[in-house]
A protein has these predicted regions:
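Conserved amphipathic alpha-helical segments that form helical-bundle/coiled-coil interaction surfaces
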Residues: 1-62, 79-86, 94-106
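C-terminal all-alpha effector/ligand-binding and dimerization domain
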Residues: 57-133
Length: 133
């Protein structure tokens, strides 16, 4: 968590910071998954992660202005903090609600990418595989 805090405590998000954050983000999500001890869930997520835009960091960088990017990434990372605390306290229902809400950030980003295909395509060339063009 401190690595993510450090990366997002900058004035400007560079491609290097995005890459470092994405790696940290993937480790965080994998750590939560592994800690579940649910082998069926682990296998299902592994299969899901082979789909376009499905893995945890698939839609990074965000597809908006740099200021909005920073705000969204800070929001998503704050959700990481809240989820981890809820899990530590054994708050199952809250953890589930936070995890579901956390997926909304990716969905918002994907909707923005689809709405702004011309601007999004250079950042995420694979978007053409999903929506054509």
């Amino acid at each position: 968590m401190t690595e993510g805090d450090r990366l997002l405590n900058t004035k400007k998000l560079t491609h290097e910071i995005y890459a470092e954050y994405a790696a940290m983000n993937d480790r965080f999500h994998d750590g939560i998954l592994q800690a579940s001890g649910n082998s069926a869930l682990i296998r299902a997520v592994a299969l899901n992660n082979k789909l376009p835009f499905a893995p945890a960091s698939a839609t990074l960088p965000m597809l908006s202005t740099h200021v909005q990017d920073h705000d969204w990434m800070r929001y998503a990372h704050r959700q990481h903090h809240m989820l981890l605390e809820a899990l530590k306290r054994g708050e199952g229902a809250r953890s589930q609600a936070l995890a579901i809400e956390h997926t909304e950030v990716a969905q918002i980003n994907m909707r923005a990418a689809l709405a702004q295909r011309a601007q999004s395509a250079p950042q995420l060339p694979a978007i053409r595989l999903v929506v054509g063009g």
